[in-house]
Amino acid sequence: MENNRNFFITIALSVLILAVWQYFYVLPRSEAQREAARVEQQRVEEQKKAAEAANPGAGTPAPAPGTIPNAPGGDTVTVAGRDQALAASKRVKIDTPSLEGSINLTGARLDDLKLKHYTETVDKNSPEIELLNPQALPTGYFAEIGFVGNDKTGAVPGAETVWNVDGNPTLSPSTPVTLTYTNDKGLTFKRTFSVDANYMFTVSDTVQNSGSSAVSLFNYGRVTRYDKPAVASTYVLHEGLIGFTGTEGLQEHKYASIEKDKQYQPGKATDGWLGITDKYWAVTLVPTEKQPFQPRYAFFEDGRHRYQSDFLTDAINVEAGQSATVETEVFAGAKEVAKINAYAEDRHIKRFDLLIDWGWFHFITKPMFWLIDTLYKFLGNFGLAILATTVIVKALFFPLANKSYASMANMKKVQPKMLEIREKYADDKMKQQQAMMELYKTEKINPLAGCWPVALQIPVFFSLYKVLYITIEMRHAPFFGWIQDLAAPDPTSLFNLFGLIPVTLPHMLMIGVWPLIMGVTMFLQMRMNPTPPDPTQAAIFTWMPVIFTFMMAGFPAGLVIYWAWNNMLSILQQGVIMKRQGAKIELWDNLMALFKKKPSPAE
């Protein structure tokens, strides 16, 4: 049938483009990025320049007004382990239901943070995700808040300031931690860290001026990272520097783009947030509300290469004998949809929901996630939720599909007339097309009706792919049996007898059980209709399920399961509708024809 062929060909081309892009661009780029990351890490580890001497008892010397201190480029990189790097400085412990780590008293940095609920792999003994690491490590990654002063203010808190703990030495949701520092100009800085049960820290800085004259100083915050993800990001989502500030709104700078541009500085703002984001994790700063600040995104090449998102407030004036307080919120954790949305609403963080990259088609992707997540709460399994979502989508669009398949059935009835027209005007394509249109008009057939299943299938397919790819809720979400991660490809393979033969196979040969099921269901669905008379189209229909089986093998298992289940439902739906319309279902005849001996050309 003409329209059904168009249906499959359109779907095939759409998925083929995505698969070819993933196989020939994403995978090689990922491998190249992993190798580049390995080389860079080796280079960093070999780089052992002497650290600049620093007096641990003093604050950071006052830099020029309006500048933000950034991590020294030539500092020492330790080849020791993480534990040794942490032991090199005094610390305050962090212990919450979601986080564990410590605050470095040198600089009052958040540079040691692990996520309790997330591990590197699905293995039970897999280590927890290390989100933040000390600067001395090749994977240095931290958040820091400080001040910029002048000669009048004296030394103000910065990267090298050693703070004193006042009271409680452990930060938890119920026990804030207070740090203090006093300089020789009569300025006392009191910093209070508090944290909720999830991933949000609140840093409250009070500056008490005990001197005899007013002072002005600036508050800054920065998220600095020395490495970048080993696996390259794709156009499916953004990884790198990010922020939403002022009237310019969302700013996204991939690692490669900021390496080229070196620095980007949007206009001043009085609200918003900025930081660095990965696929599943992020570290962001939310400056004091209504306090004007200058955001910046930068890449530094002096010494160790590093990426930085930072802000610098306007001058904060503190009269003699008075005090001033500024507050900065720091998000450091997993990009869980519900928590991100709650922070945006409860804390009035403007468009904080954009920390999750829903893409241009967010109006489809977000409802798709909401539906899957809602069903998960009832079913307790994301795989079952995906299957239930497919049923609901099919049911919602059943009336439209009914009309579409009814039109296809009518097209089958006029198939003989269409063949006559093709034979009659075989050498005149223009007249053939005109005759076809006249036939459609006479028989009251809409040849475009068969496109509706395609129009519905493609956005659902891509939105589900996006949900599986970007949302942390799908990460390590099990289905049943061997599928322990719906966001990863099916780990089995036909070519090693599904694990019975202990051999490591290349990516292109990892044809698992679910891709095979998907291929079989696609084959059956295509055989529901007559074999195309055109030899080229017939060959496409014959080989398309095989090609798709190989292509889909590298996609997330959740997407392949959806595709196979959708094929099954489509077979059932098409069979019911065609039977109602009195159209012949060609499935059994086509299957029997596969086993019949084909006549030789001489016969």
From Swiss-Prot:
Membrane-related topology note: Multi-pass membrane protein
Compositional bias of kind Basic and acidic residues: 38-51
GO terms for cellular component: plasma membrane
CDD domains linked: 5TM_YidC_Alb3, EcYidC-like_peri
Alphabetical keyword list: Cell inner membrane, Cell membrane, Chaperone, Membrane, Protein transport, Transmembrane, Transmembrane helix, Transport
Biased composition (Low complexity): 52-74
Region (Disordered): 38-76
Keyword set includes Aminoacyl-tRNA synthetase: no
Function in brief: Required for the insertion and/or proper folding and/or complex formation of integral membrane proteins into the membrane. Involved in integration of membrane proteins that insert both dependently and independently of the Sec translocase complex, as well as at least some lipoproteins. Aids folding of multispanning membrane proteins.
Stored PANTHER family: CYTOCHROME C OXIDASE ASSEMBLY PROTEIN COX18, MITOCHONDRIAL (PTHR12428:SF65), OXA1 (PTHR12428)
Protein name, entry field: Membrane protein insertase YidC
